[in-house]
Amino acid sequence: MEERSDSEPTPGCSGPGPAPVRDGGGAHTWAPEDAWMGTHPKYLEMMELDIGDATQVYIAFLVYLDLMESKSWHEVNCVGIPELQLICLLGTEIEGEGLQTVVPTPISASLSHNRIREILKASRKLQGDPELPMSFTLAIVESDSTIVYYKLTDGFMLPDPQNISLRR
């Protein structure tokens, strides 16, 4: 393998080199600046947030692609929350609806009740409407790029009646 002379770490990146690489703890670390996504404008925008490491940026980018391409969300933007060291995605699932906060996280991450509460509060600020109930969608990303979404709220939420199918 040829060594690159310009292999300085990118801000927010754990280091140069192709991805994925498995470290001793079994978790994946990614540094895909040589891959096509390393030149994608949204990936570069996430890197410029200078939050977290290459793994967090990679996971956020995978969730972004899933929301835009598979789930056909109308608009998705990335926002950094420096005090929580998080990259969040803000978007609208359907044009004209309110903003939703999506928090990409690796499957290996552990979230305490306090951490979830901090994310709920930050999400409310990002959505800009203090009247809305505190909520965010947790996007859990597996090492094979499988993504599972869970909506977390502050307390119980009744389901939207139009989304309930009637049984007969």
From Swiss-Prot:
One GO term describing the cellular component: nucleolus
InterPro entries: tRNA-endonuc_su_Sen15 (IPR018593), tRNA_endonuc-like_dom_sf (IPR011856), tRNA_intron_Endo_cat-like_sf (IPR036167)
MF (Gene Ontology): nucleic acid binding
Phosphoserine PTM positions: S7, S165
Domain of life: Eukaryota
Subcellular location: Nucleus; Nucleus, Nucleolus
Membrane-spanning segments: none
Main location: nucleus
Pfam family, one: Sen15
Region annotated Disordered, chain positions: 1-32
Keyword Amino-acid biosynthesis: no
The family this protein is said to belong to: Belongs to the SEN15 family.
Database matches in PANTHER family: TRNA-SPLICING ENDONUCLEASE SUBUNIT SEN15
Subunit structure, interactors included: Homodimer. tRNA splicing endonuclease is a heterotetramer composed of TSEN2, TSEN15, TSEN34/LENG5 and TSEN54. tRNA splicing endonuclease complex also contains proteins of the pre-mRNA 3' end processing machinery such as CLP1, CPSF1, CPSF4 and CSTF2.
Physiological role: Non-catalytic subunit of the tRNA-splicing endonuclease complex, a complex responsible for identification and cleavage of the splice sites in pre-tRNA. It cleaves pre-tRNA at the 5' and 3' splice sites to release the intron. The products are an intron and two tRNA half-molecules bearing 2',3' cyclic phosphate and 5'-OH termini. There are no conserved sequences at the splice sites, but the intron is invariably located at the same site in the gene, placing the splice sites an invariant distance from the constant structural features of the tRNA body.
Protein name: tRNA-splicing endonuclease subunit Sen15
Organism: Mus musculus
Encoding gene per record: Tsen15
